[in-house]
């Protein structure tokens, strides 16, 4: 699950990114609204061609590959992917600043490293690794494979042969076909959204503040501490993961199965598994997200599943395995889906209402009122004028965007039905015709609320295409069609985020668009290769193993539900699902209507949903990370503000990168020499 980019609340959708800790405004030497450092003055900005450099592309490829491995690991274990944009911007700065420092010491002439180049590298790297989770490798595409087909069990919609096993050719071709068109759909409206409407795009603004802060004297001083912190915890995390590997030579072995709170709690997945990836993720996420995941684990594994399991033989047959969708696992999956859909439904209507209201207000005003005065701050006014001029000069012909979008529509309408015979060419045409309208609504809403609704549009499309295609073709058509719509809508919103970052860092839109295309092209190759490496090396999709990949089965069951309706649900599951849908909807409403001092204690239904399938161990890991940040902020808040992202990135990257050599060892049939297992005393 990759919770979408958001600043205030986490989780309107299940595949997106988790909210992060952002630097407190009082600790930054910048105004977040303008992202302008006091030390920055009007400057000569390089042309867009000079902003896209060979060293930058190489750095983006390396960062994109590293984060693709990390994101893929998270997507195939819990599916809860944290927002890594700030971490990627930090890595881009550290890589290029380190490179230029080495050249300086060697006496080699080099071009200066600017914030514009930093922004381009971050954009390119993020575009690369976004394909790893946005492309559906841990959800919809995984839901197409034979193992997930078998786990879904026998049902009229889950017809024999309704699966497509992973392969590099069709996967790379499919994500390439659906990833580029979204970048073109809203280019003609970029000035309207960023300059005329002055949409904030909070995540894009936060990234710009960070990048601008790097390129100051104080930022350079802080960067040295961040480099040391990152390298220290990267090394610690990598060595610890390497050490743990020696003790995992069998089933249910190693520190990842350490019964921290006793064997009884361990059986209910309550233990600390020493995963530094999720400790780092917990440091990036807000305290509320982490506590919400723990509450979800307690509610599900501590209360619900033990109670429902006692109904074996009455609510569901006693002679089928618990992993069957007709057994306990069916309740786990559909109650999780109910929480996701309840939270997503509320946020869909919320963002739709906010968007319509804001557009109506803007259309009723004169255009001149859209330009806000700077309160007499002449320097700020000059900065804004320079930003607007740079952003306007880097134009991209509207006719070229329209022509490119039309050409990609035709290509996709030809290619995708060849990959999936269940997807008709007119399904693709309908998706491409509706995508610009949905993309504008989503991009506008994201600019106001920082909530990316692409995953909700994708789920709606999944149900529509599944029902439209009918029983024999519905599952495949729903999974492929939902991925298509989601990616088209998400790409345009992500590009607007990057344009906002570029506007505030005085980066040319042309260089950002080029970076997006380069990064997307790299991601279309890197993501399938990374996925296939993991898929062949590990037992992906095993409900009782480490690599649970829960969202593959969730999305397949959504498609089955779209074809068959509620008849597919186990006994009493519909009533329970309706209750949890209402629970999620009411809690989401409460977060918006209650006073701030009370609303901040209302748990997030989306974050609560994840442990329903994957267990509570990762929630404990994330709470450990949250506790570390809490203590650090109490001891030295100023240091914690700029060191937490570096330390968290080091923990995530070290543990995540170890997955790459461990998968190579697994493919080479080299097994760990020791199995450390815990059993009750005699």
Swiss-Prot record:
Keywords assigned by UniProt, alphabetized: Ion transport, Iron, Iron transport, Membrane, Transmembrane, Transmembrane helix, Transport
Transmembrane domains' residue ranges: 56-76, 79-99, 124-144, 167-187, 236-256, 288-308, 334-354, 396-416, 428-448, 460-480, 514-534, 549-569, 574-594, 612-632, 640-660
Expression across tissues: Expressed in roots of young maize seedlings. Not detected in leaves of iron-sufficient plants, but accumulates in roots and leaves of iron-deficient plants.
InterPro entries reported in the protein's UniProt record: OPT, YSL-like
GO terms for cellular component: plasma membrane
Bilayer topology annotation: Multi-pass membrane protein
GO MF, one annotated term: iron-nicotianamine transmembrane transporter activity
Region Disordered: start-end pairs: 1-36
Keyword RNA-binding appears in the UniProt entry: no
Location in the cell: Membrane
GO biological process: response to iron ion; seed development
Induction: Induced upon iron deficiency, but no effect of copper or zinc starvation.
Cysteine disulfide links: none
Phenotype reported upon loss of the gene: Plants display leaves with yellow stripes. Iron-phytosiderophore transport is increased at low pH and inhibited by the proton uncoupler CCCP.
Main subcellular location: membrane
Family: Belongs to the YSL (TC 2.A.67.2) family.
Function: Involved in Fe(3+) uptake. Acts as a proton-coupled symporter for phytosiderophore- and nicotianamine-chelated metals. Capable of transporting either Fe(2+)-nicotianamine or Fe(3+)-phytosiderophore. May transport iron, zinc, nickel, copper and, at a lower rate, manganese and cadmium.
NCBIfam families reported in the protein's UniProt record: OPT_sfam
Name of this chain's protein: Iron-phytosiderophore transporter yellow stripe 1
Source organism phylogeny: Eukaryota, Viridiplantae, Streptophyta, Embryophyta, Tracheophyta
């Amino acid at each position: 699950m990759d919770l979408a980019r958001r600043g205030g609340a986490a989780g309107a959708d299940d595949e997106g990114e988790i909210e992060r800790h952002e630097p407190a405004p009082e600790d930054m030497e910048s105004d977040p609204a303008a992202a302008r450092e006091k030390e920055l003055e009007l400057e000569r900005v390089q042309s867009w061609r000079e902003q896209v450099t060979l060293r930058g592309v190489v750095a983006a490829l390396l960062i994109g590959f590293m984060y693709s491995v990390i994101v893929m690991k998270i997507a195939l274990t819990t599916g809860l992917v944290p927002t890594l944009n700030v971490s990627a911007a930090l890595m881009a700065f550290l890589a290029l600043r380190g490179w230029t420092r080495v050249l300086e010491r060697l006496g080699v002439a080099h071009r200066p490293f600017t914030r514009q180049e930093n922004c381009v590298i971050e954009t390119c790297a993020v575009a690369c690794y976004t394909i790893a989770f946005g492309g559906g490798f841990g959800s919809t595409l995984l839901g197409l494979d034979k193992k997930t087909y078998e786990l879904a069990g026998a049902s009229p919609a889950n017809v024999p042969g309704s699966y497509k096993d992973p392969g590099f050719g069709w996967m790379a071709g499919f994500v390439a076909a659906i990833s580029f068109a979204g970048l073109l759909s809203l280019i003609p409206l970029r000035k309207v959204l960023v300059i005329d409407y002055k949409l904030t795009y909070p995540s894009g603004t936060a990234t710009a503040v960070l990048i601008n802060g790097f390129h100051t004297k104080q930022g350079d001083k802080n960067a040295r501490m961040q480099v040391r912190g990152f390298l220290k915890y990267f090394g610690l995390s990598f060595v610890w993961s390497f050490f743990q590997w020696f003790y995992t030579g069998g089933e249910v072995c190693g520190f990842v199965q350490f019964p921290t709170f006793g064997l009884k709690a361990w059986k209910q997945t309550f233990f600390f598994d020493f995963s530094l990836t999720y400790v780092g993720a917990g440091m990036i996420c807000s305290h509320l997200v982490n506590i919400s995941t723990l509450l979800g684990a307690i509610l599900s594994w501590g209360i619900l599943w033990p109670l429902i399991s006692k109904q074996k033989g009455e609510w569901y047959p006693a002679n089928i395995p618990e992993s069957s969708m007709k057994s306990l696992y069916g309740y786990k999956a559909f109650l999780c889906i109910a929480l996701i859909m309840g939270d997503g439904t509320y946020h869909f209507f919320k963002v739709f209402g906010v968007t319509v209201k804001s557009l109506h207000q803007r259309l009723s005003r004169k255009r001149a009122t859209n330009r806000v005065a700077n309160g007499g701050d002449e320097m700020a006014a000059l900065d804004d004028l320079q930003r607007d001029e740079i952003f306007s000069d880097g134009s991209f012909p509207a006719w070229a965007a329209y022509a490119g979008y039309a050409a990609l529509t035709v290509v996709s309408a030809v290619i995708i039905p060849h990959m999936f015979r269940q997807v008709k060419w007119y399904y693709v045409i309908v998706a491409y015709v509706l995508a610009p309208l949905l993309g504008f609504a989503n991009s506008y809403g994201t600019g106001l609320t920082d909530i990316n609704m692409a995953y909700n549009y994708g789920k709606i499309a999944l149900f529509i295409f599944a029902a439209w295609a009918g029983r024999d073709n519905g599952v495949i058509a729903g999974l492929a069609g939902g991925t298509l719509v989601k990616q088209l809508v998400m790409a345009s919103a992500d590009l607007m985020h990057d344009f906002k970052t570029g506007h505030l860092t005085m980066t040319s839109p042309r260089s950002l668009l080029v970076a997006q295309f380069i990064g997307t092209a790299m991601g279309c190759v890197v993501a399938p290769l990374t996925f296939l490496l993991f898929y062949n090396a590990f037992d992906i999709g095993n409900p009782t193993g480490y690599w649970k990949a829960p969202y593959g089965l969730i999305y397949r069951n959504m498609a089955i539900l779209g074809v068959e309706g509620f008849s597919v649900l186990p006994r009493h599951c519909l009533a329970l699902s309706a209750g949890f849908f209402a629970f999620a909807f009411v809690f989401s409403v409460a977060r918006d209507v209650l006073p701030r001092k009370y609303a901040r204690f209302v748990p997030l239904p989306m974050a609560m949903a994840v442990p329903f399938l994957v267990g509570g161990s990762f929630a404990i890991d994330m709470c450990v990370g949250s506790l570390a940040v809490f203590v650090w902020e109490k001891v030295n808040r100023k240091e914690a503000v700029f060191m937490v992202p570096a330390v968290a990135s080091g923990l995530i990257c070290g543990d995540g990168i170890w997955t790459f050599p461990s998968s190579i060892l697994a493919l080479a049939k080299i097994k760990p020499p020791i199995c450390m297992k815990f059993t009750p005393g005699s």
